[in-house]
Amino acid sequence: MRIKLYGRVIGIFLKKHSFINVLISLQLIAVFVIGIIMTSIIDEKASSYEAVKPLLNGEGLYCGGYFLKDNENGGLLENTDEIKTQLKDVDFISSVNFASLQTGVDTQTNEVKTAYALVYDDYSANLFRPTIEKGSWITDSKQSDDIPQAVITRNYQGYNVNDIAEFETENGTLKVRIIGVIGDNEKYLGANSEYESNEPSYQLMLSTHFNCLNDQLKNKGFTNEEIALKLESLGYSADSIVYNEPVLFFTDKEWNKTDLDSVMSDSLFIKYNRNISDDEKLYNRKYINENLSVLSFAIQFSQLNNNSQTIVYRELYTLMPIMCAIYLLVLIASVSVNAINCKNNIRNEAILYLGGAKRKQLLTINVIYNGLICIVSLIISIAGSLIFYKAGLFSKTVITLGWKPITICLIVCAVYILSLIHI
């Protein structure tokens, strides 16, 4: 009987003040969408650093460049054992190796088109796991196959999960089974050749890839005119749609099935033992600089870690006040509109009170009424964001629908309902 009464009264409130209710709902949807966007941005900034933080917390060197056997004889190194034997007090060395595969010939420029292979050892494959758009990451595959398995970036060839991709090599045609696809603008472990900063940080260790060069330039803030000039400088017409070469990711176990060589010309992580002395660090750094490689960089973990913390905290300190200000403005507006709504309902509540309804019952009706509007708004926000996400409209952004954005929305929903309880 009481449930029917509550339902009837709430139905009257919703119908009588439909315009105000829609206005409140739109404001709440704005709050939830802003929450999803801002939480995704903050999480993206923090989570990338958190993934590599355990490594950077220790002592060691992060190196990038072409690693040679020695200055006199040349010859690119293919494994880390040759380096470790020459260094002092090293715990382990992990690498990301590089290889090039031919995919065809560009019809406009007659240049050979290539795909780039990154080969991870066990440590580097698990150090940073990119967000997979389809399929699984290289360490998660449970398939047993004589054909090498790899993950690929989104690509103009249209290779998808379970496809057999073919590439030309010095040993003939190489067949690769695709087990996963990484979307545009997703980070992966590999030296970022485009990173320019006086504060080298974790961002130097992570690269991003776009299937389309036009989209990549647009993501960097290039105008349409600047993109046209850039394309012309590369030998294309100004209105061309130019595709980047795909990147493939292998474990060293899978790469060994190819009988092809890979070289240490991307990333090298040299982790020292905890008690390494300053003299041994100096020796290692000097040996790398003078004997082993044509270096792009060799940076201490401690420097990367300190700069990473500075950059992440700086960005969070910038974003948090903006997020809080927007939240408060929209939330206060929602509460204000709801206060007007409550004022309009005073007459109805007075009638119920005179009819025998107790204050606790009126409070329950008010909570259910406001909670219903808030929950419906939350469902619309999440459902709408999910539709956009599935449609790929967020593919070039950092917006995600993980548990963190949804948790923030639930907290805001609870705070909103509690703020409207008449004490």
Residue ranges and their predicted role:
Residues 39-122, 223:
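Membrane-proximal extracellular/periplasmic loop immediately following the first transmembrane helix
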Residues 113-240:
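Hydrophobic secondary-structure segments that place a key small or acidic residue at a functional site
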Residues 18-46, 310-350, 371-384:
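Hydrophobic alpha-helical transmembrane segments of multi-pass inner-membrane transport and secretion
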Residues 65-69, 250-253, 269-276:
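Short beta-strand-to-loop capping motifs
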Residues 261-317:
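A cross-kingdom feature of multi-pass membrane systems that activates on extracytoplasmic/periplasmic
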Residues 329, 335, 348-397, 408-412, ...:
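Transmembrane alpha-helical interface segments in multi-pass membrane proteins
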Residues 1-8:
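Short, membrane-interfacial amphipathic segments enriched in basic
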Residues 421-423:
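Conserved small/polar residues in nucleotide/adenosyl-binding loops
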